[in-house]
Amino acid sequence: MSNDNILKNIHEINLSYLLLAQELIKQDKKVASFRLGVCEDTLNKISKLSLSELIKLGAINQLICLLRLDDEKVINCLTRESRVDELQQVHTGIMLSTQLLRSHKSNSNHALKE
């Protein structure tokens, strides 16, 4: 895949992510915060962006969404065969929410030090 195609794909993913984020925020802000892994201030800012601002933000050359599955053990656990799919989804939610809480605590502690 050429570099131009990669950048085009990144821009499309970014815009899709931002549009999805706005839709999630409209439906339920607390659920959006959990699913997106961002704080309320960020949700408020994203919800107020116009389409032209979303397009501009989506056109940066880096992915704006973060892969929250950044631990090999977590990935292995979540991709393992499960006899009960619903249980696997609950387990995934627990793993991601725990990771989100750790992230927020770390950010809060960092902000207090400044």
Swiss-Prot record:
Signal peptide as annotated in the record: none
GO molecular function, one term: DNA binding
Biological processes, Gene Ontology terms: bacterial-type flagellum assembly; positive regulation of DNA-templated transcription; regulation of bacterial-type flagellum assembly
Transmembrane annotation, as ranges: none
Gene Ontology annotations for the cellular component aspect, listed alphabetically: cytoplasm
SUPFAM superfamilies linked to this entry: Flagellar transcriptional activator FlhD (SSF63592)
Main location: cytoplasm
Compartments, record wording: Cytoplasm
Keyword annotations from UniProtKB, A to Z: Activator, Bacterial flagellum biogenesis, Cytoplasm, Disulfide bond, DNA-binding, Transcription, Transcription regulation
NCBIfam families to which the protein is assigned, alphabetical: PRK02909.1-1
Domain free text: The C-terminal region contains a putative helix-turn-helix (HTH) motif, suggesting that this region may bind DNA.
Function of the protein: Functions in complex with FlhC as a master transcriptional regulator that regulates transcription of several flagellar and non-flagellar operons by binding to their promoter region. Activates expression of class 2 flagellar genes, including fliA, which is a flagellum-specific sigma factor that turns on the class 3 genes. Also regulates genes whose products function in a variety of physiological pathways.
Stated family: Belongs to the FlhD family.
Subunit organization: Homodimer; disulfide-linked. Forms a heterohexamer composed of two FlhC and four FlhD subunits. Each FlhC binds a FlhD dimer, forming a heterotrimer, and a hexamer assembles by dimerization of two heterotrimers.
UniProt-recorded name of the protein: Flagellar transcriptional regulator FlhD
The organism of origin for this protein: Wigglesworthia glossinidia brevipalpis
Name of encoding gene: flhD
